Amino acid sequence: MDYDFKVKLSSERERVEDLFEYEGCKVGRGTYGHVYKAKRKDGKDDKDYALKQIEGTGISMSACREIALLRELKHPNVISLQKVFLSHADRKVWLLFDYAEHDLWHIIKFHRASKANKKPVQLPRGMVKSLLYQILDGIHYLHANWVLHRDLKPANILVMGEGPERGRVKIADMGFARLFNSPLKPLADLDPVVVTFWYRAPELLLGARHYTKAIDIWAIGCIFAELLTSEPIFHCRQEDIKTSNPYHHDQLDRIFNVMGFPADKDWEDIKKMPEHSTLMKDFRRNTYTNCSLIKYMEKHKVKPDSKAFHLLQKLLTMDPIKRITSEQAMQDPYFLEDPLPTSDVFAGCQIPYPKREFLTEEEPDDKGDKKNQQQQQGNNHTNGTGHPGNQDSSHTQGPPLKKVRVVPPTTTSGGLIMTSDYQRSNPHAAYPNPGPSTSQPQSSMGYSATSQQPPQYSHQTHRY
């Protein structure tokens, strides 16, 4: 390359340190790199941004794939990549996103902590409905554009704080997303293990090779149940964190303890699953005779005749062929009864959730989880965010993660497929404060976060 051209190119290249002020504003840290809350130096706007510095030098193929997807996706409920900076001097890669102040993992933890402190603060019904509708809207857009997310969980669902997009849901972390219109080989061959265990569909646990967008719908059902109860519905101890074998006995056992063992008539193709013989060897149908989703949700005061429960049943249908689609779910009667979903999930009320705190350069954002991770090496397999959660001694660990990855905050940019018309209901009552004993950890909008929740739910190492 011509020397003069290289000099000219270098002089014209925008440098992140010249454009943004971010020193001392770290909000996330992990094996993926670092995330900073940043502002423009030129004062052209007063917005907050999230700057993610990718760990290491250069750019990996997985990062290239994620960036390529993010540059194409434009929808109000999907994260939007603003810009990519390449530092020529140290070969660092920086990604710029809009800053999201909250995420579902911290929101749910806030309510779970209030319950643990005997000062229960329920997630308002209207907020749950608005959150679910916007998640479905974003996933419908992805699926309509032939994209599987493959790692949906509360930590990857961001919620914008004060500002023009107040209360807007952003689906984050496209690190495991894949196009599924014409794969060269079965997706299971490309990535044998996807989706954090607690949110993993039964067909994945049974080794399905040609899995579909139904895996995202199951994960949304898990998130919906967690919003309704403040407890992860399929939490269990995790083992074999490094295994590439999708079959997981304990996770299947947890699902059957909640849902019951699937009858042949309910899932006819279960016999075609690669791990069906292992399933029949390890499990006895009569062990789960008294288990059902109705009984589980009744314990959490969700009535089986409610529209919320009926939709949950459709999302958590064992047979992926019979599982509802995102488009069908958005048309469910649940969204037609009061309170109606709103574009601001907080419905104009005061936001009760704490803002993210800054980390020191030496302070890992997952300091509260580091010890847990060492103890859980076989217990947590999470794609970068491990949710331990638990109501009893069997769930003292968090959901396993796969590779630690970061979840960028996001912005809105208009939808290619459909932008919902959210109907606004009457404002919900303001949330009571559960008190100082429920202090929240640093949230890292899907980037990464410190988990300081009660020991039984020292949930997760967040990421971006």
From Swiss-Prot:
<feature type="region of interest" description="Disordered">
    <location>
        <begin position="361"/>
        <end position="464"/>
    </location>
</feature>
<keyword id="KW-0539">Nucleus</keyword>
<keyword id="KW-0010">Activator</keyword>
<dbReference type="InterPro" id="IPR011009">
    <property type="entry name" value="Kinase-like_dom_sf"/>
</dbReference>
<feature type="compositionally biased region" description="Polar residues">
    <location>
        <begin position="436"/>
        <end position="464"/>
    </location>
</feature>
<dbReference type="InterPro" id="IPR017441">
    <property type="entry name" value="Protein_kinase_ATP_BS"/>
</dbReference>
<dbReference type="GO" id="GO:0004693">
    <property type="term" value="F:cyclin-dependent protein serine/threonine kinase activity"/>
</dbReference>
<dbReference type="GO" id="GO:0032991">
    <property type="term" value="C:protein-containing complex"/>
</dbReference>
<dbReference type="InterPro" id="IPR000719">
    <property type="entry name" value="Prot_kinase_dom"/>
</dbReference>
<dbReference type="GO" id="GO:0005654">
    <property type="term" value="C:nucleoplasm"/>
</dbReference>
<feature type="binding site">
    <location>
        <position position="52"/>
    </location>
    <ligand>
        <name>ATP</name>
    </ligand>
</feature>
<dbReference type="GO" id="GO:0005524">
    <property type="term" value="F:ATP binding"/>
</dbReference>
<dbReference type="GO" id="GO:0005730">
    <property type="term" value="C:nucleolus"/>
</dbReference>
<dbReference type="Pfam" id="PF00069">
    <property type="entry name" value="Pkinase"/>
</dbReference>
<feature type="domain" description="Protein kinase">
    <location>
        <begin position="21"/>
        <end position="335"/>
    </location>
</feature>
<dbReference type="GO" id="GO:0045944">
    <property type="term" value="P:positive regulation of transcription by RNA polymerase II"/>
</dbReference>
<keyword id="KW-0418">Kinase</keyword>
<feature type="compositionally biased region" description="Low complexity">
    <location>
        <begin position="373"/>
        <end position="391"/>
    </location>
</feature>
<dbReference type="GO" id="GO:0004672">
    <property type="term" value="F:protein kinase activity"/>
</dbReference>
<keyword id="KW-0678">Repressor</keyword>
<dbReference type="GO" id="GO:1990508">
    <property type="term" value="C:CKM complex"/>
</dbReference>
<keyword id="KW-0991">Intellectual disability</keyword>
<comment type="function">
    <text>Component of the Mediator complex, a coactivator involved in regulated gene transcription of nearly all RNA polymerase II-dependent genes. Mediator functions as a bridge to convey information from gene-specific regulatory proteins to the basal RNA polymerase II transcription machinery. Mediator is recruited to promoters by direct interactions with regulatory proteins and serves as a scaffold for the assembly of a functional pre-initiation complex with RNA polymerase II and the general transcription factors.</text>
</comment>
<keyword id="KW-1268">Autism spectrum disorder</keyword>
<keyword id="KW-0723">Serine/threonine-protein kinase</keyword>
<keyword id="KW-0805">Transcription regulation</keyword>
<keyword id="KW-0547">Nucleotide-binding</keyword>
<protein>
    <recommendedName>
        <fullName>Cyclin-dependent kinase 8</fullName>
        <ecNumber>2.7.11.22</ecNumber>
        <ecNumber>2.7.11.23</ecNumber>
    </recommendedName>
</protein>
<comment type="similarity">
    <text>Belongs to the protein kinase superfamily. CMGC Ser/Thr protein kinase family. CDC2/CDKX subfamily.</text>
</comment>
<comment type="subunit">
    <text>Component of the Mediator complex, which is composed of MED1, MED4, MED6, MED7, MED8, MED9, MED10, MED11, MED12, MED13, MED13L, MED14, MED15, MED16, MED17, MED18, MED19, MED20, MED21, MED22, MED23, MED24, MED25, MED26, MED27, MED29, MED30, MED31, CCNC, CDK8 and CDC2L6/CDK11. The MED12, MED13, CCNC and CDK8 subunits form a distinct module termed the CDK8 module. Mediator containing the CDK8 module is less active than Mediator lacking this module in supporting transcriptional activation.</text>
</comment>
<feature type="region of interest" description="Interaction with CCNC">
    <location>
        <begin position="1"/>
        <end position="15"/>
    </location>
</feature>
<dbReference type="InterPro" id="IPR008271">
    <property type="entry name" value="Ser/Thr_kinase_AS"/>
</dbReference>
<keyword id="KW-0067">ATP-binding</keyword>
<dbReference type="GO" id="GO:0106310">
    <property type="term" value="F:protein serine kinase activity"/>
</dbReference>
<dbReference type="GO" id="GO:0000307">
    <property type="term" value="C:cyclin-dependent protein kinase holoenzyme complex"/>
</dbReference>
<dbReference type="InterPro" id="IPR050108">
    <property type="entry name" value="CDK"/>
</dbReference>
<dbReference type="GO" id="GO:0004674">
    <property type="term" value="F:protein serine/threonine kinase activity"/>
</dbReference>
<dbReference type="GO" id="GO:0005634">
    <property type="term" value="C:nucleus"/>
</dbReference>
<feature type="active site" description="Proton acceptor">
    <location>
        <position position="151"/>
    </location>
</feature>
<dbReference type="GO" id="GO:0016592">
    <property type="term" value="C:mediator complex"/>
</dbReference>
<dbReference type="GO" id="GO:0008353">
    <property type="term" value="F:RNA polymerase II CTD heptapeptide repeat kinase activity"/>
</dbReference>
<keyword id="KW-0804">Transcription</keyword>
